[in-house]
């Protein structure tokens, strides 16, 4: 039975809709598709419409979860729960525009839309023109503290505005209003609905949860390999090494997708060496090509290049750019399946060398000095304007789908991308927040930016640890920022935020960022950095098990506090604390405590005023051992343990916490089980035959330890294992349940050491059968 209502059969009651068609279609009992005019040809939606039982009455239609009403005079739609609770309603609008206005409750908080770099969570009172860029990425997905979500299905630049007249979306192109309303009941519930609509999240390789080192850029294979060697010599953990741009040589050969300089004379051998050192290799690729590349010539001959001005603008590699020598670099039409096939045909060469992961830079793409003729230029399926914001989705999807089709593919696709659009979580990508400035203000902005991004349904977010542009700290000469105490403190605190991101990656320009640039072992800054890296590796069983929950149960890594504590209004706009998975409350220090923080300007390309920074540079040694303090909030509805001290606190209170340089404040929710791995130099150096299980009493708890082969897609066939664990708080008993499933290389025997916050511990042997541990 068709579930679409239109002007012609509207609710079987001949409702007039002011000369416009209104289509109301239930995709699932909790997802409703609204169209006025012509629908968008979707690049995002993957869900198949379910056969949803409906109850129709004059002026309304209901599923088991939602009721939708249609005003017969105005054509406006209202959404309610099946029990009649008002969720959201439309207002009348100008039918000559691709625009819809909605009425929100007074004080109703709304979230999402992507990575706004304004330091806010709640979107009330904001006006923003949403067009993909380096620093801000937009997914037209919004959700409310009331538990509903909305996906605006339009790919053109769109203005979001909330004011006294209502909340509206106004798009620059389109033939109709097209959006999906979702009822989730909570933040996690809305995310689950969005993924049901646009696709689930595939697993990433286990090794990607280790530490990554990068910089702009390693200038030879010798330099890159020496970095891996140095980490191994220092016995500091490392899993990923990244080669940034220009390994191809001239800008006229931009993105040739091959090693074309003497400094990278044998790319395959270099990658083999990385693998022999038990590390993995990621390489930078772009969505544009220089005029001397094979890709440019083939795409140009087929009319599959765009005329927009992009990076690099100069054909010379000098800085600043010499514009009298234009590069001729052009962006490819990623909306064309033929163009995407050509892209992979040449990228496959790097894949054949053994590349483990892709760094898809400038997937926005860079778009300078835009002209009206650029926006009206035809691309496959529309115009540049009509499809503009979906470009990152199209190019990332092309690489993901092509690699998945490779017959010998034993590697999970891992793509790091600078931009993202709705539904991109389905295509093996993790988005970083762009070329952010190295400042405390920008660090503070990354927390709400990452949370807002996660609320759109894509859980995979990271940042350039330390910020990309740190040149203002080079007060003692070129590349000296890591010796500047102001930058040292910022870098350590950024590392502590990065500890909680799905990808833990140090990168940037203006100065190298390897750990030894900041000092040597035994010195406070070096030791603080090393401590964060080592802690990350201990967290990996928790992280990887969370990844499984992300894939199978629509969980998230970075979760705003209102995800679990929506009844506590104090956390509705919390921008400096968040949940890391389901159990850990991360409360990183986001202000300078040992050095001065005077911000002169916030321009992402220049950062701080260099003269002022030099004047502010501390004179004399910094006492990094001094204890400081910071105020943090513990939400109502749970009790909390200080991760470091084991002290227990009630929720609903502000605490003044003693801090030190090498510790990031964090708390564990009472009623949690956390698995900890042994220390290791790289993922896989040691197996998980001996794990710690830290149990935090105060409530019943459950956790599922997930394991598989660590790479490849056999998990999609059920080749993996789960070990369920439960804590009964009344009996103080931990039950480690019988293992479910198996995979090649699975451990047959292991030990778990159960540890309580008061230090009591007990070690148990486990061979796959249920065991109980009474504490």
Regions found by a protein language model. Give the residues of each.
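Hydrophobic h-region of N-terminal signal peptides that target proteins for export
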Residues: 10-18
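Short, acidic/polar
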Residues: 220-233, 340-348
């Amino acid at each position: 039975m068709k579930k679409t209502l239109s002007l012609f059969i509207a609710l079987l009651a001949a409702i007039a809709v002011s000369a416009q068609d209104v289509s109301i279609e239930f995709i699932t009992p909790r997802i409703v598709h609204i169209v006025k005019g012509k629908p968008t040809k979707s690049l995002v939606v993957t869900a198949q419409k379910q056969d949803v039982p409906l109850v129709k009455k004059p002026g309304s239609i209901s599923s088991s979860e939602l009721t939708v009403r249609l005003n017969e005079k105005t054509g406006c739609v209202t959404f309610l729960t099946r029990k009649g609770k008002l969720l959201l309603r439309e207002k009348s609008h100008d039918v000559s525009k691709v625009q819809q206005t909605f009425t929100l409750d007074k004080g109703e908080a709304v979230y999402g839309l992507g990575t706004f770099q304004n330091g806010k969570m709640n979107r009330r009172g904001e006006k923003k023109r949403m067009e993909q860029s380096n620093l801000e990425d937009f997914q037209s997905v919004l959700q409310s503290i009331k538990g509903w979500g909305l996906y605006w299905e339009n790919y053109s630049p769109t203005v979001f505005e909330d004011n006294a007249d209502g909340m509206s979306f106004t798009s620059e192109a389109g033939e109709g209003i097209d959006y999906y309303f979702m009822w989730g009941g909570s933040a996690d519930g809305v995310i689950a609905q969005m993924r049901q609509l646009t696709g689930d999240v595939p697993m990433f390789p286990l090794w990607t949860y280790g530490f990554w080192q990068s910089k702009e850029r390693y200038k030879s294979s010798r330099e890159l390999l020496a970095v891996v060697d140095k980490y191994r010599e220092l016995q500091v953990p490392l899993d990923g090494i990244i080669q940034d741009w220009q390994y191809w040589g001239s800008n006229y050969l931009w993105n040739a997708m091959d090693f074309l300089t003497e400094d990278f004379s044998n790319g395959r051998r270099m990658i083999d060496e990385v693998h022999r050192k038990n590390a993995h290799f990621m390489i930078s690729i772009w969505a544009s090509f220089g005029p001397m590349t094979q890709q440019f010539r083939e795409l140009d001959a087929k009319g599959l290049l765009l005329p927009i001005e992009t990076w690099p603008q100069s054909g010379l590699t000098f800085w600043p750019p010499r514009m009298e020598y234009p590069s001729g670099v052009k962006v490819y039409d990623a909306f064309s399946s033929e163009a995407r096939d050509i892209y992979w045909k040449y990228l496959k060469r790097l894949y054949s060398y053994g590349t483990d992961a892709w760094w898809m830079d400038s997937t926005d793409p860079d778009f300078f000095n835009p002209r009206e003729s650029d926006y009206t230029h035809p691309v496959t399926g529309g115009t540049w304007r009509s499809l503009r914001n979906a470009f990152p989705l199209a190019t990332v999807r092309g690489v993901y789908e092509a690699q998945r089709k490779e017959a010998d593919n034993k590697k999970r696709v891992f793509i790091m991308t600078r931009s993202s659009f709705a539904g991109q979580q389905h295509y093996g990508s993790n988005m970083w927040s762009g070329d952010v400035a190295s400042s405390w203000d920008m660090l503070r902005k990354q927390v709400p930016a990452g949370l807002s991004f996660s609320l759109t349904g894509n859980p995979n977010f990271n940042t350039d640890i330390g910020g990309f542009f740190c040149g203002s700290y080079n007060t003692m000469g070129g590349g000296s920022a890591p010796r500047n105490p102001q930058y040292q403190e910022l870098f350590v605190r950024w590392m502590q935020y990065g500890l909680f991101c799905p990808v833990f990656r140090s990168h940037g320009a203006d100065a190298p960022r390897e750990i030894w640039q900041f000092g040597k072992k035994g010195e406070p800054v070096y030791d603080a950095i090393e401590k964060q890296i080592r802690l990350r590796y201990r967290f990996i069983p928790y992280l990887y098990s969370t990844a499984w929950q992300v894939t199978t149960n629509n969980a998230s890594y970075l979760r705003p506090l209102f995800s679990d504590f929506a009844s506590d209004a104090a956390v509705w706009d919390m921008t400096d604390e968040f949940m890391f998975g389901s159990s850990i409350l991360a409360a990183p220090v986001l202000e300078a405590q040992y050095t001065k923080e005077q911000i002169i300007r916030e321009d992402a390309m220049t950062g701080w005023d260099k003269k002022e920074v030099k004047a502010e540079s501390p004179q004399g040694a910094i006492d990094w051992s001094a204890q400081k303090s910071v105020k943090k909030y513990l939400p109502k509805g749970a009790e909390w343990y200080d991760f470091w001290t084991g002290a227990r606190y009630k929720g609903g209170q502000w605490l003044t916490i003693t801090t030190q340089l090498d510790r990031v404040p964090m708390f564990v929710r009472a009623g949690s089980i956390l698995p900890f791995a042994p220390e290791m130099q790289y993922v896989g150096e040691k197996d998980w035959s001996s794990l710690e299980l830290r149990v935090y009493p105060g409530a019943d708890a459950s956790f599922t330890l997930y394991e598989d082969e660590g790479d490849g897609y056999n998990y999609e066939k059920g080749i993996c294992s789960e070990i369920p664990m439960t804590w009964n708080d009344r009996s103080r008993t931990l039950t480690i349940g019988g293992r479910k499933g198996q995979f090649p290389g699975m451990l047959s025997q292991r030990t778990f050491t159960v540890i309580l916050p008061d230090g009591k511990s007990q070690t148990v042997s486990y061979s796959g059968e249920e065991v109980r541990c009474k504490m």
